[in-house]
């Protein structure tokens, strides 16, 4: 779960 402005679904 990462809150990164960009949209990284890893």
From Swiss-Prot:
Pathway assigned to this chain's UniProt record: Energy metabolism; oxidative phosphorylation
Bilayer topology: Single-pass membrane protein
GO biological process: oxidative phosphorylation
Keywords: Membrane, Mitochondrion, Mitochondrion inner membrane, Oxidoreductase, Transmembrane, Transmembrane helix
GO CC list: mitochondrial inner membrane
Keyword DNA-binding (UniProt): no
Protein localization: Mitochondrion inner membrane
Keyword tRNA processing attributed: no
Gene Ontology terms for molecular function: oxidoreductase activity
Domain of life (superkingdom): Eukaryota
Family assignment from sequence similarity: Belongs to the cytochrome c oxidase VIIa family.
Function: Component of the cytochrome c oxidase, the last enzyme in the mitochondrial electron transport chain which drives oxidative phosphorylation. The respiratory chain contains 3 multisubunit complexes succinate dehydrogenase (complex II, CII), ubiquinol-cytochrome c oxidoreductase (cytochrome b-c1 complex, complex III, CIII) and cytochrome c oxidase (complex IV, CIV), that cooperate to transfer electrons derived from NADH and succinate to molecular oxygen, creating an electrochemical gradient over the inner membrane that drives transmembrane transport and the ATP synthase.
Assembly and interaction partners: Component of the cytochrome c oxidase (complex IV, CIV), a multisubunit enzyme composed of 14 subunits. The complex is composed of a catalytic core of 3 subunits MT-CO1, MT-CO2 and MT-CO3, encoded in the mitochondrial DNA, and 11 supernumerary subunits COX4I, COX5A, COX5B, COX6A, COX6B, COX6C, COX7A, COX7B, COX7C, COX8 and NDUFA4, which are encoded in the nuclear genome.
Protein's name in the database: Cytochrome c oxidase subunit 7A-heart, mitochondrial
